[in-house]
Amino acid sequence: MAEEKKTTRKKIQAADKMNKIMADYFHGLNEAATTGKRKVAWCTSVGPAELLRAMDFDVYFPENHSAMLGATRMSTDLIPAANAIGYSPDICSYLTADIGAYLKGITPLVKAYPGIESVPKPDVLVYNTNQCRDVQDWFAWYSKKFDVPSI
């Protein structure tokens, strides 16, 4: 029988700094959304984030939240909630996982960043359909839920 090799992991040198950067980012978004001291814009991955930052918005990317849902193995429990309200199982799982998480009131941000209870409430939703057409429907849904403009 072949001898099993033990896998060892070497911590990436920048991990602690990156963890702090991400914690500061999400806590900043949370503070902006809960206090109203700063405006929050949701933006798609190839949206005009630089322009939004230049207009003094704190920018949140729902696709990153969906990636967290997938990485934490939560998506499979959340996608059916979006399917149940009419979203096809054949469309973007980022959309359906994220909407499912909203419908169920859960997010991995709670565990990753103590003190954060939900995704930040947007003041505006800004998208670009260059990467996919589904983001228009995704942001339109949230526009109705949060009663904010989607452009």
Give the location of each predicted region.
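An N-terminal assembly and electron-transfer interface module characteristic of large anaerobic redox
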Residues: 1-151
